[in-house]
Each structure stands twice: as C-alpha cells, then as structure tokens.
Amino acid sequence: IIETINAEGLAVTVKDAEGNAIPYVEKKKIMQPFGDRSGVVIEPMLTDQWFADAKTLAEPAIASVREGRTNFVPKNWEKTYFDWMENIEPWCISRQLWWGHQIPAWYGPDNEAFVASSEEEAQAAAETHYGKPVELTRDPDVLDTWFSSALWPFSTLGWPDNTPELAKYYQTDVLVTGFDIIFFWVARMMMMGLHFMKDEDGNPVEPFHTVYVHALVRDKNGQKMSKSKGNVIDPLDLIDEYGADALRFTLAIMAAQGRDVKLDPARIAGYRNFGTKVWNATRFGEMNGVKRDAGFDPENAKLTVNRWILTELSKTVSDVTTAIETQRFNEAAASLYRFVWNQVCDWYVELLKPIFMGEDEAAKAEAQACMAYVLEQSYALLHPFMPFMTEELWAHTAARDGLLAHGEWPVSGFADADAADEINWLVDLVSGLRSARSEMNVPPSATAPLIMVGANAVTSSRLARHEAAICRLARVESISTADLAPKGAAQIIVGEATACLPLGNLIDLGTEKARIEKAIVKNEQEKDRLGKKLSNEKFIANADPDVVAADRERHAELEG
C-alpha cells in the first residue's frame, strides 16, 4: 500500500538534510482498545446480526409514562427515561455466547431465514417455501440478556399460556431498581409488556404502575464501590457484625430520594444502638409490671403524660404511614427514630419512673397499660424496618396468635393538644436547663435554684404541677418566680417566660465569659471563611454537592 501511494504521488513528503524527498512521519497517540479478559487488540469486523425495531416498541412505552399510567419515584428519573426512549436506535438483540435463549431462526440451503416458535413450524414454513422438505440449520446466536430479562414480568408466570398466576400477578404494583438500568431493563420490560400483554378489550397492559428508583450505595467517602478500589463492603459481613435489622434500618433512614447512600459502618453501629434502646425500653417495662391489657382504650387515659405520648404516637403513625405510601422511606425511619428514642425512651420512661415507684395504684395500672400499648404500636411501626427484633419482642411480650407481619397496621386518630403542649413545654424546659448546665460546665452533682421571669398563669400552674419532675431531671433545688432576672444567671427562653439559673456560686464567671468570647470570635472567623469559600464560583462548580450543601447550612447557622 505504501509503495502504491508513493508511486501515485499521494504521499506527504519532506526534504531530508541532503535535499531528498522522504515520507513525512507524524507521531500520534491512538486509542487502541484491548479485551478485558483476553488482553488482545479488539479489531472491528462487520457481521450479520438480528435487530429489533426499538423505535416502534418504544412509542407506547413513552406514552404510558407521559399519560401517568406508569410513574417514576423520584419523578426526576422520568427525564432519563425519556432521553433514552425518544432517541432510541435499532436494538441489536443477537449475541455470540454459549448461554442464553437461542434465537428462534433457522436457515435453508440458500441461507433463507425462517423465524418460528418451534423447529416444527420452521420446517413447515420451509417446505412451503421450497416445495419440498429441506434440511434447516438453526442460528447459533442467543438473545441479548436484556431481551430475555425484558420478558421477566410475564414469562415467569407461564406466558404464553393464560395461567392463573399470570392473571393474578400481571400487572405487578411496584418495581424497585437502580437508576443505572432504567434503560437496559425498565424500558425494555415496558416495551415487551405493552407489546405482548393485552387486557380483555385488547388494550396494552403495563408490567407495573410504579418504578421506585432507589439510591446507589457508595462507600463512606461517596466513591462507587469496586473491587479495583478495594472499597467493596459485603452486606453479609455487616450483618454478622451489626445485625440484619441495624443494616436494614441504616439503609432506610439514609435513602433520601434522589441522593446516594454513603455507607459508613459507624452509622450502622449507631442504629444498632437504637435497636438496643428499644430492647431496653421493653425490659424496663417488664421490670415494672408493664403488660398488654386488651381492654386498654387510649380515650380513657387520664394521666397527662399518657395522653401526651398517645398524641405523639398518633402523629408518628400518621407521619410514617404517609411517608411509606409516598415511598419516602428515609422520612418514615427518621420519624420512628425521633419518636422511639427521643420521646419514648428519653422522656416517657423517665416521667413514668415516679409513677411506677409511687403509691397510686390506679395511676400505676394506667401507666403500665399505656406503656404496653405504646410499645406494641411501636413494634408494628418499626416492623418494616427492623423485622427480626420486633417480631421477637412482639411474641415475647404477650401471648398472641400469628405473626406481627400479619397483624394490623396502627391507625392514627387520638389527639390531646393540651396534654401535648404541657409535656412538650416540660421537655423544652428541662432540655434547656440541662444544655445551659452543660455549656457552663456545672458539675453534675451540683444543684441550683430556678427562677422563672415573666411566667403567665398557665406557666405558673405547670411549674407547680411538675415541680418534682423539674427538680429531679434538671438538678434544680427550688423553683420561684420573679419580675427581673438575677445577675450572673444563665437564661433560657421557654415560651413567654425566661428560665434563669443563678450559677455564680457554682462556676467561675470570668472563665466562662472568656470562653464564650473566644467561641464568638472563632465562629465569626469560620463564618467569614465559609462566606469566601461559597462566593468562589470554581468551588461551587467543582466541589461535591454534599460538601457545598453542608457548608451553606453551616454558614446560615453561623449567620443566624
């Protein structure tokens, strides 16, 4: 070839040092592909292949999503679906592999192709074509794996026969999948389902009405897991170390729609502790005579603390139910975490202790029945997220027929706004006092008087009713009201009033003042640094979106 090019004067030449024409050589890097397994050069070669008219198949599948018969959750993935489907090319469905569904095509002596559902049908068609029996050779290729997978929603149910299973389970409700196979699998199932499956009137039937696109699980640094990076986490190893419930709850609470999961084993350990908290709350109940009372009616509860927790339980039932129905599983898990850990374990249990140790048997009996009811409802709400532990606790805490998995889902409806306001006020007050003591480095054993400034009649009556609880939980020695805040007192705003803790005799005010001033300066410096960082367009464009969001949140917090 080179000699021919030179002979015809087509070669590009340059002069050498002696003035002779020599070929011009330009050094260029080329992208040479190599096979992953063989390591040899991949050379292009034209071959005969089977293709499907994907554009025709895609049209009804596009219409199904556009018209709302099939919905994506989160909805933004519809754009990815449409981008693929509206720009689709003919689909090469043949593969040169040893495994798979063999292509149903047979060739005659002159290479005429006969496509049929069986070899007998192909032979009959060939005999009609040639006018005599001939020997046929079947195509050795197999169907693309995704072509076979596209038939899954109905081929697994006995299709093409009209089986009872096909009638019952097609169409299905929800497909759960990852975004990376929306085109390869989801779109192909839509195309095949609409092409082959029809209702009694002959109308196409979609294989599912909802496509839930779950998050991609990455490592704790946000990197995609791969063997080459050495960052693959085996779920079975995590289950062995932390338990299946802890892993399941972690994945649920971190699976915000549209965001990937950065899986850190430390987070799983934290949610294992949550499971331990639920177990310990049950154990506390058993130690204090808590047991299921089939006749317990929330509406008949008299104690404010019980009516408060029943109100919070009802809110949680509503929130969790709505979140699950809208596939916001992270919000459902977060609502349960807040209710069970913060309200039941941290506060309800603490507020029940004096009742369990008291002499009022009627109050004790109500508290025991109410706590049993709250725990039972909590097990049911937690069951989709922590099935093993909740099933065990459900069976252990009462004699029951059947499994929790087969039980009724909790129903909301109870509400006592006054009780909720009162106990939530108590929680806010004690939390504020504890926080102030911690920030001021007050010794845990030290007590201080509480002076409420600007308290109205409602607050004053609440102080009187809950004086014992406030003194016990916030390490307060006495409670009084005043018109002005005393000097040297830590101040916490609670509703319309200001809670004051005179700490002059318990801490070094000069040291605390210096510490606070130093913290203010540090916060100002951090705010300025973040402000400059966030005003840098290159940082905004190139940084991890999660990092940018965290910096913005922190900057707003410092400005507030």
Pin down the residues of each PLM region.
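Short, charged, amphipathic alpha-helical segments
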Residues: 334-336, 365, 369, 545-553
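Structured, non-catalytic alpha/beta "coupling" segments that mediate domain-domain communication
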Residues: 20-54, 268-294, 384-396, 460-498
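Alpha-helical recognition segments enriched in aromatics with Gly/Pro capping
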Residues: 1, 97-100, 104-259
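Acidic, turn-prone loop/beta-hairpin segments
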Residues: 107, 114-117, 136, 219, ...
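Residue patterns forming the tRNA-binding/recognition surfaces of aminoacyl-tRNA synthetases
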Residues: 1-110, 181, 223, 229-274, ...
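C-terminal low-complexity, glycine/proline- and small-hydrophobic-enriched intrinsically disordered tails
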Residues: 269, 395-560
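Core structural elements
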Residues: 273-286, 304-316, 334-354, 398, ...
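Glycine- and acidic
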Residues: 66-79, 164-179, 231-236, 256-268, ...
